[in-house]
């Protein structure tokens, strides 16, 4: 898919934008009331669903200017929510940061300074399981066909969620997961990592924020231990390669990675959840 095709995809998603509903539900931490944004597919259903987990910058546009709601979601999150709704899925974008007092998220390079209350390995998984509980209670959702997708910090949450040591209830957890450019340092886990359901991990060679070699070694180790993990590394792509902004998509490696990610993620979830 060339640059024109990528732009055509983005335009098509805008033209077929799904309705976005603001919803609230408790985290499985039993003390946080979460806000989330539900993209609804057309048709009577029932439908499978995908939980979306934002990165360190949070779910909102950098131009939000203090307004943090459905009208100021970042283009990337809106794009993916529309993409899944257009293909017959509910998509639920969970805001883990605003309810804890950090609506604008965190800048690059701030990992060591972030509070433990937004930990991607021990706290945010409980938010994801809260989202899972919420979706399973919705009449139009197929309760045993719910996947999860995350970016960067949210992708680290995905890896934590899919571990058989996950905070929450992994034995009755997500059907499948997509993790885009995680860091792969799973400090919260003891011993080998074992996934309880299939994972698609997507990494960029020119990532400016995380070391792709760490993820490559992690993926090889996890696969060797018998976990169902599919790994793809994109030459010439950087962190946040699927950002629809023109600056990111002007990089050829990012465009190629974006094209493949949309196609690969769609095929992956279709194979795992529409059986």
Go through each PLM region and give its residues.
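C-terminal catalytic histidine-bearing segment of alpha/beta-hydrolase fold enzymes
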Residues: 228-275
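Short beta-strand/loop motif that positions the catalytic acidic residue
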Residues: 195, 201-203, 207
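Short alpha-helix in the alpha/beta-hydrolase fold that links the catalytic acid
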Residues: 65-66, 211-221
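Sec-dependent N-terminal signal peptides
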Residues: 4-14
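Primarily recognizes the serine-hydrolase "nucleophile elbow" in alpha/beta-hydrolase
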Residues: 59, 118-195
């Amino acid at each position: 898919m060339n640059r024109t095709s990528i732009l055509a995809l983005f335009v098509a998603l805008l033209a077929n934008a799904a309705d976005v509903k603001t919803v609230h539900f408790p985290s499985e931490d039993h003390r946080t009331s979460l806000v989330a944004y539900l993209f609804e597919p057309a048709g009577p259903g029932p439908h499978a669903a995908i939980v979306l987990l934002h990165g360190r910058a949070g779910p909102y546009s950098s131009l939000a200017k203090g307004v943090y709601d459905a009208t100021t979601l970042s283009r990337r999150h809106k794009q993916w929510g529309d993409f899944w709704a257009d293909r017959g899925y509910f998509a639920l974008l969970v805001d883990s940061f605003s309810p804890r007092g950090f609506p604008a998220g965190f800048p690059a390079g701030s990992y060591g300074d972030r509070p433990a209350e937004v930990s991607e390995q021990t706290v945010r998984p409980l938010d994801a399981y809260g989202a899972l509980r919420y979706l399973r209670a919705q009449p139009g959702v197929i309760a045993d066909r719910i996947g999860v997708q995350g970016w960067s910090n949210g992708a680290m949450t995905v890896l934590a969620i899919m571990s058989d040591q996950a905070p929450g209830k992994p034995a009755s957890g997500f059907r499948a997961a997509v993790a885009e450019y995680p860091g792969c340092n799973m400090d919260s886990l003891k011993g080998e990592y074992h996934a309880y359901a299939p994972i698609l991990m997507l990494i960029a060679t020119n990532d400016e924020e995380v070391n792709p070699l760490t993820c490559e070694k992690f993926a090889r180790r996890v696969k060797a231990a018998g976990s169902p993990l599919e790994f793809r590394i994109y030459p010439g792509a950087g962190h946040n390669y699927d950002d629809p902004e023109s600056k990111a998509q002007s990089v050829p490696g990012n465009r190629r990675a974006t094209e493949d990610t949309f196609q690969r993620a769609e095929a992956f979830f279709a194979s795992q959840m529409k059986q």
